[in-house]
Amino acid sequence: MTNIRKSHPLVKIINSSFIDLPTPSNISSWWNFGSLLGICLMLQILTGLFLAMHYTSDTTTAFYSVTHICRDVNYGWTLRYLHANGASMFFICLYLHVGRGLYYGSYTYTETWNIGIILLFTVMATAFMGYVLPWGQMSFWGATVITNLLSAIPYIGTNLVEWIWGGFSVDKATLTRFFALHFLLPFIIAAMVMVHLLFLHETGSNNPTGIPSNMDMIPFHPYYTIKDILGLLLMITVLLTLVLFFPDLLGDPDNYMPANPLNTPPHIKPEWYFLFAYAILRSIPNKLGGVLALVLSILILIIIPLLHTSKQRSMTFRPLSQCLFWLLTADLLTLTWIGGQPVENPYIIIGQLASILYFTTIIVLMPLTGLMENYLLKW
């Protein structure tokens, strides 16, 4: 009798994806983040589902329904903070996952990489819409400022913004549609994750050396299932520490004030995971230029496979490229810090310099360094 694991039409798909999957024997903990992202997505869908059972997407009651969840629903506060801080964990894992792909040259699997970029955009859109739902001050003004950026698009901009708003300002129609889309998009993300994995399993995983590992593979289970569980335990520890001890550490105190269209907060800023892009947006004095820079700051990832000039795939044996990679990391952290600061000197000039450095490093310095390393290898 054949093993049901290998013969059953549904079970054999799971088997070939998570159990008998041939995996390089030398992948490090940097390869844990894919599975952590899957768990984050499941956590967000589950906590979000239970929150949606008690939430009302009406401007008059949205803020108070969130208060009701935290005060009156059994463990409602836990659900709310798991969902809010779960989003932060999601983005930490996302950025580390993308960073791993950049460092080890995983972007040479172009289909997997491009689906990943589309996923990143979709997750960012979902998180932005989720931030609007509690209908606090920062929710309202964040929604107003960010959606208003689309008015910079020539000719159709104003019509587009009013179409998204469902009126002449951010109001009830906007909140209702954002709730509907915020509920729907995670399921679309889950479907796209399947496509992401489908393309990944066509080629197999990359590994830290960047050298094909066909001759040295091990089954995913038990080796990497155990390794992933360790990563999961560490992530859950960090998440629960945030939720139970510092639930508002990453939030904005302004969001504990109900939305008031007549009172603008002194510093409008998005959640921490968008601050780097927000800093790039603010560093350009022109509105359309800022919006283009904002979109390109992430869309630039698409051309990274074209900018790969080195004869080696991974940065493991390329010290000069490693220096640039960590410079880019430090630059992104600087941008994140600047995004949370008021628009005044010296923050303006620091933000402008950091934005220039960000694009220069990716488009100019990294390809040139790759060529130089090729030359040094021959020398």
Swiss-Prot record:
Its cofactor is heme b. The gene is MT-CYB. Heme b b566 binds at residues 97, 196. One of its GO terms (biological process) is mitochondrial electron transport, ubiquinol to cytochrome c. This is Cytochrome b. The chain crosses the membrane at residues 33-53, 77-98, 113-133, 178-198, 226-246, 288-308, 320-340, 347-367. Disulfide bonds: none annotated. Its main location: mitochondrion. Component of the ubiquinol-cytochrome c reductase complex (complex III or cytochrome b-c1 complex) that is part of the mitochondrial respiratory chain. The b-c1 complex mediates electron transfer from ubiquinol to cytochrome c. Contributes to the generation of a proton gradient across the mitochondrial membrane that is then used for ATP synthesis. It is a multi-pass membrane protein. It comes from Myotis vivesi. The cytochrome bc1 complex contains 11 subunits: 3 respiratory subunits (MT-CYB, CYC1 and UQCRFS1), 2 core proteins (UQCRC1 and UQCRC2) and 6 low-molecular weight proteins (UQCRH/QCR6, UQCRB/QCR7, UQCRQ/QCR8, UQCR10/QCR9, UQCR11/QCR10 and a cleavage product of UQCRFS1). This cytochrome bc1 complex then forms a dimer. Heme 1 (or BL or b562) is low-potential and absorbs at about 562 nm, and heme 2 (or BH or b566) is high-potential and absorbs at about 566 nm.
